[in-house]
């Protein structure tokens, strides 16, 4: 049975941990507000670019742009993995790494068996996991979310588009956590290349007038669309990470509170038992003197 001193030491340790988790929750909440704003603001722009690309694809021969052209065979795959730089965010990193692992070993098992799967890792957790296991990592961006900037998204987009154009990749997919709510990030994977524009349809689509020509505009719009999509998923992942961390630290703080309650009860019981024992010894000693 633990002594009073042992329980006091443990209570002190739990209180210290509770202060840390409470502070981390407040920091994550502050970061979440800004990250959420950035993610939500990026969505309409990315959506509009996608809509314009769909409208243009109805008017031009998409096979003329190699980034819009499907390959007859998919032998080389690039997986862009977006994870966090730090832990203490629940199952955020574990779930996304599991999804990427499943994607590589099930969906692209044939390509993986021939060393045809490569990785680009944004975030330290995914980078460390796959690097230690000997996977082919083309580029790693550990620490990227400490100084998140559009230039990183542009660099990743230019890397994968260059690989696709040179025939070093037949498909590029991105795996990330999409921010939906504080309690429920959504695991997602999307195909970035080849780009598949959504058909606008004959009715209901916007009737744009293009100058100088749809062909010249689509050549400019395609790389811009790719840059924007990579940037959007990075913003979504960052917001989802802060939400997951805030939720995890809130749970940890509540668990510490419950543990303190249990420890205080144990402390009081042990203290009462010690007092009772001392009283019994005093009474026993007094009786012995009388006898």
UniProtKB/Swiss-Prot annotation:
It is found in: Cell inner membrane. Keywords: ATP synthesis, Cell inner membrane, Cell membrane, CF(1), Hydrogen ion transport, Ion transport, Membrane, Transport. The keyword Transport applies. CDD domains: F1-ATPase_gamma. It comes from the Bacteria. InterPro entries: ATP_synth_F1_ATPase_gsu, ATP_synth_F1_gsu, ATP_synth_F1_gsu_CS. One of its GO terms (cellular component) is proton-transporting ATP synthase complex. F-type ATPases have 2 components, CF(1) - the catalytic core - and CF(0) - the membrane proton channel. CF(1) has five subunits: alpha(3), beta(3), gamma(1), delta(1), epsilon(1). CF(0) has three main subunits: a, b and c. This is ATP synthase gamma chain. NCBIfam families: ATPsyn_F1gamma, PRK13425.1. Its main location: membrane. GO terms for biological process: proton motive force-driven plasma membrane ATP synthesis. The keyword Cell membrane applies. Belongs to the ATPase gamma chain family. It is a peripheral membrane protein. HAMAP family: ATP_synth_gamma_bact. GO terms for molecular function: ATP binding; proton-transporting ATP synthase activity, rotational mechanism. It comes from Chlorobium phaeobacteroides (strain DSM 266 / SMG 266 / 2430). PANTHER family: ATP SYNTHASE GAMMA CHAIN, ATP SYNTHASE SUBUNIT GAMMA, MITOCHONDRIAL. Produces ATP from ADP in the presence of a proton gradient across the membrane. The gamma chain is believed to be important in regulating ATPase activity and the flow of protons through the CF(0) complex.
């Amino acid at each position: 049975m633990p002594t009073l001193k042992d329980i006091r030491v443990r209570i002190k340790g739990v209180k210290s941990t509770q202060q840390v988790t409470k502070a981390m929750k407040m920091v994550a909440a502050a970061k979440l507000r800004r990250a959420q704003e950035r993610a939500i603001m990026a969505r309409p722009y990315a959506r509009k670019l996608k809509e314009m690309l769909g409208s243009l694809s109805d008017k031009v021969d998409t096979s003329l742009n190699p980034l819009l052209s499907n390959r007859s065979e998919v032998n080389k795959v690039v997986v862009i993995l977006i994870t966090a730089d730090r832990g203490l965010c629940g199952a955020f990193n574990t779930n996304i790494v599991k999804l990427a692992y499943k994607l590589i070993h099930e969906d692209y098992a044939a390509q993986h068996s021939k060393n045809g799967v490569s990785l680009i890792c944004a975030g330290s957790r995914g980078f460390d996991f796959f690097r230690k296991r000997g996977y082919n990592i083309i580029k790693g961006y550990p620490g990227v979310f400490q100084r998140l900037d559009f230039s990183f998204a542009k660099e990743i987009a230019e890397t994968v588009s260059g690989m696709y154009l040179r025939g070093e990749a037949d498909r590029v997919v991105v795996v990330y956590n999409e921010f939906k709510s504080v309690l429920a990030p959504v695991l997602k994977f999307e195909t970035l290349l080849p780009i598949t524009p959504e058909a606008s349809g004959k009715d209901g689509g916007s009737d744009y007038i293009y100058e100088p020509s749809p062909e010249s505009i689509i050549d400019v719009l395609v790389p811009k669309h790719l840059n924007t999509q990579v940037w959007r998923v990075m913003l979504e992942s960052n917001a989802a990470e802060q939400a997951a961390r805030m939720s995890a630290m809130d749970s940890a703080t509540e668990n510490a509170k419950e543990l303190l309650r249990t420890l205080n009860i144990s402390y009081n019981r042990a203290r009462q038992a010690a007092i009772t024992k001392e009283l019994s010894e005093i009474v026993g000693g007094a009786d012995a003197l009388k006898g």
